Amino acid sequence: MAGKAAAPGTAVLLVTANVGSLFDDPENLQKNWLREFYQVLHTHKPHFMALHCQEFGGKNYEASMSHVDKFVKELLSSDAMKEYNRARVYLDENYKSQEHFTALGSFYFLHESLKNIYQFDFKAKKYKKVTGKEIYSDTLESTPMLEKEKFPQDYFPECKWSRKGFIRTRWCIADCAFDLVNIHLFHDASNLVAWETSPSVYSGVRHKALGYVLDRIIDQRFEKVSYFVFGDFNFRLDSKSVVETLCTKATMQTVRAADTNEVVKLIFRESDNDRKVVLQLEKKLFDYFNQDVFRDNNGTALLEFDKELSVFKDRLYELDISFPPSYPYSEDSSQGEQYMNTRCPAWCDRILMSLSAKELVLKSESEEKVATYDHIGPNVCMGDHKPVFLAFRIAPGAGKPHAHVHKCCVVQ
């Protein structure tokens, strides 16, 4: 039986995971990853579980097809999942189509004790009862049970296509209707460019893309419901402010390319102390001498530089972060806590929600802690991103006042 008998309501587990690394080293990383994932499942015993993956299939999807199949089969048939008798899996495998491919994978699992679960058909505009296990992987564009979009080409930096977009599904559980949106936003192409301005040019691109998604999911085409948006937002710390703080007493040396005079490296040295190098910055190098600053007290001293969400504070809510930056961890399977020196560590992987969804998460009749927001595999190599999860319970009756509106019981 999922959930503890003493805790009423429906237990929900939302997980986001950028899994690109898993398919580059499946032998070592997948076993670790699945073990840690199942552990979280065992601890929280959800009735409904959603796993949103980005970069599914890794850097080279075609070469990873067999690993993808194996991963999906393992998830669906493992002992840890045997009580989940209904599942929906949506994999964007259309890697040959530049204008459509997002490399997103969305997995939804329903516990056998959960009754009357409905999923929305966006074409028919009605809810359908969820039965059995189904996998969709060819052209998700024609699947009526979801909406998938890649961002318009002019949203992409320099209009260069990359695998960024979103997938939306809608569910009705315990008379509560809500959207679950899997999202992957744009990364920082260059540490040097990110450092130039505050906020960075990349943060502006992400802001525009996230605004686009939020506008799409509350537009006039469908009834408005609560929503959870979780994925790899690629949110970064404000680079200029972070560097100023980490290097307060340092002097900066600029290295330029001989032929173009372009800045290729910044070196920050202490004024005394034998002019010790504190930080080296290149396009894809962020080499700070003391990584502990990102781990001590879970890096929370750096949260003041995590500003990208503040623009959306009237539309999106997030529980307090008490876990270290989720990216970029070493991909060496023997290194579980080490960051790579490619980027400034940041909380890229997040679970955000609409203000009405916040009420759903925090509404509880008891005083006990109702929600857990944390990362998975703190001491184990999970690839370059640590998955992040939110576990909560939908309180009994939370959706009752709206049940007639959602027409969840009007099923085809």
UniProtKB/Swiss-Prot annotation:
Lipidation (S-farnesyl cysteine): 409
Post-translational note: Isoprenylation at Cys-409 is required for localization at the membrane.
Protein name: Inositol polyphosphate-5-phosphatase A
Cited function: Phosphatase that specifically hydrolyzes the 5-phosphate of inositol 1,4,5-trisphosphate to inositol 1,4-bisphosphate, and inositol 1,3,4,5-tetrasphosphate to inositol 1,3,4-trisphosphate. Plays a crucial role in the survival of cerebellar Purkinje cells.
Gene name tied to this protein: Inpp5a
Molecular function (Gene Ontology), one example: inositol-polyphosphate 5-phosphatase activity
E.C. number: 3.1.3.56
GO biological process terms held by the UniProt record: negative regulation of phospholipase C-activating G protein-coupled receptor signaling pathway; phosphatidylinositol dephosphorylation
Keywords recorded for this protein, A-Z: Cell membrane, Cell projection, Hydrolase, Lipoprotein, Membrane, Prenylation
UniProt key word Nuclease: no
Cellular component aspect of the GO annotation: dendrite; membrane; plasma membrane
UniProt KW Zinc-finger keyword: no
